[in-house]
């Protein structure tokens, strides 16, 4: 299922395509998706309900490489399914998400592959605006990350506070500034 873009990046800022309104990227609400490891769909939905009053707000959903990829090219499909349920849940409440990969110091290519696999599992989640670029990536690795993701997910916007480029949106996470 291919989703249409709901947001776009212009000069380092995020805008809603429907209204043209600038989105607030200065205080994303943090959520550690690691709590979804090994949980049922019901538990994932209960986690989403915590954000039922956050219509229009954006969550920074931290996705650990090690949570998504158990070992090389072996993915935790139960975790990814729970992540999808969570993201579909916040979608029903009108909240949005930016997936923030946590690299755990791993190889950039494996991290990119794991996040591409993650994106495939959450591809029908309209709540997902895009992905943040891990600070650990070099400029060329960041470009490779975006290229790999864009092959199948051209609607995503990319976020970074370290990497340069007018197509990248800067952001801050509430409580972590």
Label each PLM-derived region with a short phrase.
Residues 83, 111-115, 142:
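Amphipathic alpha-helical segments in well-structured domains
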Residues 41-103, 143-157:
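Aromatic-lined substrate-binding rim segments of carbohydrate-active enzymes
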Residues 1-60, 147-151, 169-177:
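N-terminal carbohydrate-binding accessory modules
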Residues 40-44, 107, 162:
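General structural signal for secondary-structure boundaries
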Residues 92-95, 116-177:
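Active-site region of glycoside hydrolase catalytic domains
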Residues 6, 50, 55, 66, ...:
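Arginine residue identity/basic-tract feature
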Residues 101-107, 135-138:
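Short glycine/proline-centered loop/turn elements that form peptide/ligand docking sites
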